């Protein structure tokens, strides 16, 4: 399995943490969220490792570079959102000729996401021939998570954030991780 790139999304402010420090720079069991996720994606040996930054961009970029001097830093513009972060990264990497195969996208606020799970995700994606593959789970209490909305054949139609979900979507227990 050859990954052309792994993109770590680290642009968010993390306002619910009520901290002056970017959420991704908070420590969890001795390492920052960012370093934990970079460990997991780097274990897959992507050709390019990129980190998307925006809030306190220089501080986050410095932390990413201290992890890996070769990391590609992508500056997200002022248009908010996860989708926009991915657009910015894909545009920069494509323009630089760094996208010629599968691309893994990982959120930097998932410090428990391990490399084995990501490895299985990429293997599944490659074997399935999917255009995109989303890692999901089913929770007894999905409060606070984006819901996975599927069609009658089981294909993912969209991910609806809790604040935007209607009552039937709120009843869905499958969430994006």
Predicted region positions:
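Conserved beta-strand scaffold positions in the cores of enzyme catalytic domains, especially
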Residues: 25, 73, 132-134
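Glycine-centered loop/turn positions within well-structured domains
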Residues: 15, 23, 58
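Short beta-strand/turn micro-motifs composed of small residues
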Residues: 10, 53, 107, 136-137
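Conserved core of the sugar-phosphate nucleotidyltransferase
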Residues: 58, 113-177
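Conserved N-terminal catalytic core of the sugar/cofactor nucleotidyltransferase
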Residues: 2-5, 31-123, 150
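N-terminal nucleotide-binding beta1-loop-alpha1 segment
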Residues: 1-19, 49
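Short alpha-helical oligomerization interface
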Residues: 20-30
């Amino acid at each position: 399995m050859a990954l052309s790139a792994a993109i770590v999304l680290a642009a968010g402010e993390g306002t619910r943490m009520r901290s002056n420090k970017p959420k991704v720079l908070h420590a969890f069991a001795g390492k920052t969220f960012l370093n934990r996720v970079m460990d997991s994606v780097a274990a897959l040996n992507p050709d390019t490792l990129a980190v998307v930054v925006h809030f306190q961009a220089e501080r986050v970029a410095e932390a990413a570079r201290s992890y890996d001097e070769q990391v590609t830093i992508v500056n997200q513009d002022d248009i908010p959102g996860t989708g926009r972060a991915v657009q910015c990264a894909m545009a920069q990497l494509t323009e630089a000729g760094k996208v010629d195969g599968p691309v893994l996208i990982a959120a930097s606020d998932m410090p428990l996401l391990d490399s084995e799970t990501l490895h299985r995700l990429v293997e599944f994606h490659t074997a399935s021939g999917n255009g995109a593959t989303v890692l999901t789970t089913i929770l007894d209490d999905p409060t606070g998570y984006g819901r996975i909305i599927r069609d009658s054949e089981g294909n993912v139609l969209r991910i609806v954030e809790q604040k935007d979900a209607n009552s039937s979507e709120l009843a869905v227990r499958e969430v994006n991780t």
